[in-house]
């Protein structure tokens, strides 16, 4: 296990602090090809009240060398085995000292260097979740994806977690369910909405989301996890199934048979 906390004199304390402290987290594992651009995107933010945490799952491919290269700009980083991305995200929430937390994982980027300043400088929020729009990065190019109004939550996911900021206190009280490998974020936001959690669309593009990696590595798991949830909770599972149904229409028939099998 490696656990690094930056000395106080290695963190820029010269600028006056803005109103709300934001924690940005990057979770990674063997991400040597993606991690540097994500780190650069985070440390280039002009907002001055940010802590940056990296939680690595015990990489062996050179990822740690890149993290060490930027260690003076990282508030804290740890490298140790974990039980998956959502276990690592829960771990980072326990480390966080900010009021809101954003997960910008390896391969994903902020829309530009002024995202945090545009949202938080000179402003203060009380909502449980702030969210915005996303640029989807496919292998062949980019596609804007506007956030939806929160009343669409019963039928679709209005935003992705890279384009959201969640109160740290809320995530500590209701951590991601690590029994899900791919859809714990969707389950978290849906359950928060159902329990009366408050959301605010900040009407800005926040993240550039690496969809190529998602589609190739995650969507199939997401689809079948959603089907399993549907068997246990038809309302929640049906909602999650619709999130990925459009991408896997050929699987629809067999998945419906699985969900409704006696």
What are these regions (language model features)?
Residues 205, 217-242:
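Catalytic core of nucleotide-sugar-dependent glycosyltransferases
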Residues 1-218:
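Nucleotide-sugar donor-binding/catalytic module of glycosyltransferases
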């Amino acid at each position: 296990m490696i656990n690094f906390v930056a000395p106080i004199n290695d963190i820029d304390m010269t600028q006056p602090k803005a109103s709300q402290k934001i924690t940005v987290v990057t979770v990674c594992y063997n991400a040597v090809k993606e991690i540097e651009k994500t780190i650069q995107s985070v440390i280039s933010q002009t907002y001055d009240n940010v802590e940056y945490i990296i939680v690595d799952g015990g990489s062996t491919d050179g990822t740690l060398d890149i993290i060490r290269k930027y260690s003076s700009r990282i508030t804290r980083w740890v490298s140790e085995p974990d039980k998956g991305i959502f276990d690592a995200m829960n771990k980072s929430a326990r480390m966080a000292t900010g009021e809101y937390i954003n997960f910008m994982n390896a391969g994903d980027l902020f829309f530009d260097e002024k995202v945090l300043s545009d949202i938080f400088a000179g402003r203060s929020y009380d909502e449980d979740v702030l969210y915005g729009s996303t640029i989807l990065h496919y292998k062949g190019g980019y596609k804007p994806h506007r956030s939806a109004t929160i009343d669409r939550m019963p039928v679709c996911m209005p935003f992705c977690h890279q384009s959201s900021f969640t109160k740290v206190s809320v995530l500590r009280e209701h951590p991601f369910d690590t029994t899900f490998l791919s859809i714990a974020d969707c389950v978290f936001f849906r359950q928060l909405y159902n329990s009366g959690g408050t959301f605010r669309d900040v009407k800005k593009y926040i993240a550039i989301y690496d969809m190529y990696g998602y589609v190739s590595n995650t969507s199939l798991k997401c689809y079948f996890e959603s089907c399993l949830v549907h068997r246990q909770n038809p309302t929640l599972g049906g909602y999650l199934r619709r999130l990925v149904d459009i991408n896997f229409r050929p699987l629809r028939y067999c998945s419906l048979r699985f969900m409704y099998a006696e």
